[in-house]
Amino acid sequence: GTHVVIETADLSKKDECLRLMSALGDKRIGVFINNAGFGDCGRFADTSLDKDLDMIDVNIRAVHILTKLVLRKMRSQGGGYLLNVASSAGLIPAGPYMATYYASKAYVASMTRAVARELREEGSQVYVGALCPGPVNTEFNSVANVEFALPGITPEYCANYAVDQMKRRRTVIVPTFTLKAATTLGRFIPQSAYIAIAGHQQKKKLARR
């Protein structure tokens, strides 16, 4: 059977990210999924500063550290797949009432696109991509204190779609037609209007609490 080793790490801490990489030692990494992250919903002035900073540490700093270190390892071993889990929120200019979360996922999407371009230009066999789903039926909803306007997809569907698109070496992976249409819409309407629409959706979540 398959031998599984579980390593527990608090990715909000830099030292824990480094320890996780150290624990991998000289093992070859075929696929690395940067999946840790969480969100929060509310007016920016009213949400917890500590929670915001933890979100930045997990959603941005940990992803940055692990992407850089795993990328170096994959380059030295001659290839591999690295998938950063961002969000469709990262493809939208801004998200009122989830300001920190949207900004954190925009960082991941932007960084991933840039790194993917660098790798293509150097002819690398390493793949780097960003998975940008919308609502997925996980515990994210309860942690973020939100109810989504759109129905969520199952984790199984999201994972299977992501792996399929990763193997096709797609840089940005958006799992559903509805979200592809929504993120594409932003190219054709003023940013201020798009941000207002996004904010309206988040505000409805607050009203349903």
Spell out what each predicted region is.
Residues 8-19, 49:
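The beta1-alpha1 cofactor-binding region of Rossmann-like NAD(H)/NADP(H)-dependent oxidoreductases
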Residues 35-40:
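Conserved NAD(P)H cofactor-binding loop of Rossmann-fold oxidoreductase domains
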Residues 43-45, 51-56:
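Substrate-binding pocket helix/loop in short-chain dehydrogenase/reductase
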Residues 67, 104:
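Active-site helix of classical SDR
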Residues 87:
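Residue(s) in the substrate-gating loop at a strand-loop-helix junction
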Residues 94-100:
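Active-site loop-to-helix junction immediately N-terminal to the catalytic Tyr of the SDR YXXXK motif
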Residues 130, 147-183:
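C-terminal helical subdomain
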